[in-house]
Amino acid sequence: MDKHITTPITEEITADLHSGDYVYITGEIYVARDAAHKRMIEALDHGDELPIDIKDATIYYMGPSPAREGHPIGSAGPTTATRMDKYAPRLLDLGEKAMIGKGKRSKEVIDAIIRNKAVYFAAVGGAGALLSKCIKKSEVICYDDLGAEAIRKLYVEDFPAIVVIDKDGNNLYETAIKEFAK
């Protein structure tokens, strides 16, 4: 089923999302990859505040290519989510509600998704140029020394994704394999 959703992603929104749903996201989302996730966790370990408002936030695992003149961002395809698996449960426990990436997630992340009524979306790998057309604004907000891995705030319109793991832990990667094997 196709659903149009707007950030911030709240529990009311995740309650209506099911594994296999196609979604079109509009609103502000953050971009962070493994180096930025590591720094955020280190900040928390030192008793510092996070550089982003994590409550009901969506984090897109992506490192963009440079923007062409007149464009807010270059190619913006998803990166492999498993690299964030050691950091994601803590951020989910602090209020993050959605992640966008590609690939499978660990049991620990799935447990945190269920515990926090969150959701994991997949974006289509290899479609970064197409996905960038949905990004209307891009701003580096911290860790600019990380270059493409800096934390960015994006404004997206009708950004396409698929619900892979819903708030109940239903996992499209597992159900699709079972369905295909029939």
For each feature predicted by the language model, list its residue ranges.
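Short, structured beta-strand/loop micro-motifs enriched in basic residues and often containing a Trp
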Residues: 1-9
